[in-house]
A protein has these predicted regions:
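Extended, charge-rich alpha-helical interface modules
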Residues: 1-68
Length: 68
């Protein structure tokens, strides 16, 4: 049960990482420019989300003994 819960947490944060990367890609194209006048701040927020999610994934991997 513990392993399933940890794998679910890892999957959740892997999805958050992917979401942040997609958002950054959108900001790199004209679609996102009109909505966010401060693109640097918007991208920085996505990088912060990505890094937090990555740390969570790495933490779960460490707990499970699956460090990659």
């Amino acid at each position: 049960m513990k392993e399933k819960l940890l794998r679910a947490v890892r999957a959740k944060h892997q999805a958050k990482m992917e979401e942040a990367l997609v958002n950054i890609e959108v900001y790199e194209h004209s679609v996102g420019i009109g909505e966010h006048p401060d693109l640097v701040e918007a991208v920085e927020a996505q990088v912060d989300k990505y890094v937090h999610a990555l740390e969570m994934v790495e933490g779960v991997n460490s707990i499970l003994g699956e460090e990659h």
